[in-house]
């Protein structure tokens, strides 16, 4: 039977000590470890998309994975490639997924089962080789599919491939504008043309890992080794958190933001959680409950709790729970 909220699931989980995972301490926040064997042994999870308080979708090595709070279900793509990205669209009532040279969407049939519809099969052959689809975004009835060196735009049944003369490492839709992070800095898409983000020249030599909105306008750009930067379209300045040395030493790989909180996943030392209202910093790693120190994806759910896709397995950090641990791991 589907559980209607993650909070209820996690609470029961802790109280009943279900054998599917284990709850351990992490700075007074419970962490639930989900082993990869629960969803077909696909190790890496590259993207996470919570949806409507009831489900979470994962871009996993084995396919698109659905979790309803109780049951894990794997949906492979037509070419059985790793799934790199997933987008839960509340407007279209679809789950978009991108793999390697393939993208499409899952939609409920009349009996409620998800059915896959491949979109990339309808592309002209020379546009079909998008490589790894690391990002899928939507705005103003336009769907954007980000590949290794191009973005495919889908509007009114028509595809437009927009090539970028650089490797695209990440992308995000912020206030209706598509930003991309490349090995040539940060760019924005205007119409069907990429333009460099004004005032952000100093980022051209950085490895860009993510771009998130800043509550005062502009964006925060996340780099792999050199911390965070605030860009307003005119100037770019460091966004100082006090965790710059940690980021430099452990290589930031992914980011998620919600309200005043920023979650950063690292390659070597787990999760970093920053509260921008107080600049308090918390760390979650193998020493205090995280299953694995290599974090490939992060996402907040609607309750403010945090999902982390690891190099092996998935973890759930219950940040909003009133339950706390009496003990911590060394």
Regions found by a protein language model. Give the residues of each.
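Carboxylate-rich, polar loop motifs that coordinate divalent cations or form catalytic acidic clusters
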Residues: 1-330
């Amino acid at each position: 039977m589907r559980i209607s909220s993650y909070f209820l699931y996690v609470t029961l989980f802790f109280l009943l000590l279900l054998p599917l995972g284990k709850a351990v301490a992490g700075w007074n926040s419970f962490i639930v470890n989900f082993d990869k064997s629960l969803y077909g042994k696909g190790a890496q999870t590259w993207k996470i998309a919570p949806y409507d308080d009831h489900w979470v979708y994962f871009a996993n090595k084995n396919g698109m994975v659905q979790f309803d709070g109780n049951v894990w279900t794997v949906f492979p793509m037509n070419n059985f490639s790793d799934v790199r990205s997933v987008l839960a669209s509340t407007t279209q009532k679809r789950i978009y997924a991108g793999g390697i040279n393939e993208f499409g969407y899952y939609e409920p049939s009349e009996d409620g089962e998800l059915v896959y519809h491949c979109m990339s099969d309808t592309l002209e052959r020379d546009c079909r080789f998008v490589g790894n689809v690391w990002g899928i975004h939507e705005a103003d009835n336009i769907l954007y599919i980000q590949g290794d060196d191009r973005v495919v735009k889908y509007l009114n049944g028509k595809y437009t491939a927009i090539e970028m003369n650089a490797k695209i490492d990440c992308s995000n839709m912020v206030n209706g504008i598509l930003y991309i992070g490349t090995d040539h800095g940060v760019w924005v898409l205007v119409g069907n043309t990429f333009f460099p983000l004004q005032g952000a020249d100093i980022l051209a030599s950085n490895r860009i890992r993510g771009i998130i909105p800043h509550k005062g306008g502009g964006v925060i750009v996340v780099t792999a080794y050199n911390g965070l930067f605030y860009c307003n379209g005119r100037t770019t300045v460091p966004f100082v958190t006090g965790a710059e040395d940690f980021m430099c030493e452990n290589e930031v790989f992914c980011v998620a933001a919600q309200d005043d909180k920023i979650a950063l996943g690292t390659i070597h030392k787990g999760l970093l959680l920053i509260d921008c209202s107080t600049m308090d910093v918390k760390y979650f790693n193998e020493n205090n409950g995280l299953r694995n120190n290599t974090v490939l994806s992060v996402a907040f759910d609607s309750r403010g709790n945090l999902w982390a896709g690891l190099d092996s397995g998935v973890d759930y950090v219950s940040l909003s729970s009133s339950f706390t641990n009496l003990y911590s791991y060394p």
